[in-house]
Amino acid sequence: MEQQPQNTRLRNAGFLTFFFSGICAISSGVVVSLLQEKYGFAYGMTGTLLSLMSIGNLLAGFLTGVLPGVLGFKPSVLLLTTGYALGYGMMGLSGAELLLSVSFFLVGIAKGSAMNACTILVSGNSADRTRGMNLMHSCYACGALLCPFLIAAAGRVSTGLALLVLAALGIIVWLIYLTTPMDGQGSTKSKTGKEKIDWSFLHSVQFWLLTGLLFCQNAAEQSVTGWMVTYFKGSGIITGALAAYTVTVMWGATLVARLLIAFVFPFKQPRKAMVVMGVGCTIFYFFLMQAHTQGAAILLLFAFAFAMAGMNPTAVASAGKMTSVTSMGIMLPAASSGAILMPWIIGRVAERAGLAVGMACNIVPCIGLVLFAILVARMPKEN
């Protein structure tokens, strides 16, 4: 009976820290624009800072997969999640490009580390993994929805105050992890009592298919998140300040979908559900690229985000007992590389053939979602 309250506490710690992580991580896109206005650096520097954050996020996954075998799970999480407080704190000190570069890299490290830690805490301590993961990502979406209003309010006083608020939230994340008992989370024990890394998941075909599916999901989702505002403005479909609120449309759809999956319409057959979601994403994205009116564009963007919302948490939950600190340290960063690669490809294609052609390329990872989901659905279930 004592185990149940402990599991609930660990799961809730994952929910709460992922909510704050949603604020800190998504705020980076707003912060970089504030810093650009304040210090006047070029657009190339803006792209570099965001790329460094993505690289930090990628590296964090590998570090959280290896460091627990040396330091233990909790010390590793505490070390790596200092990045939010340190990163945003350093941004407020100076506009030096080197310091800003290090700051965004540290924020990326914290983002990836929090993702890994929360996945372990929630997935390993939820009776229903699919519901738990969808609820966890709903917490992140709530934070993402809140961050523009929080930064705007603090930014009215000064950019420095906005950065200080984010650094304070980073400290809160760290303190929650500090006070959460995490012994034995995401690891196995050897006869000597030390944590032993289990690499058996590397031999699982299902693990690599799920990683491929998440790679496509990250690629498709980040491309829309990163490029859609620019695409809408450039094409004249949505103009002015309204274009910036398309991000709110996406996160609103994401939150609604994940809450519905978690509480109203839970998936009885998650693998088949991923196939349906993949098909939905592909169809809605195809018609989104054909939209020429503001109403149709917003409606199709909402539908795309709604269809995409359950893919990531459902795929991670489908990993079952393969969900360990080490396996997530391989799966999540490998998958997140799609979020680095596809937006870059769109940019390169757009330079040569126009942004419309570049955005059309994003249909490729959407189709990849369908193919990987079908392959996963045909695999024998691994608990």
Predicted regions and their residues:
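Conserved MFS/SLC helix-loop-helix module at the cytosolic interface between two early adjacent transmembrane helices
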Residues: 59-98
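C-terminal transmembrane helical hairpin of 12-TM major facilitator-type secondary transporters
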Residues: 268-315
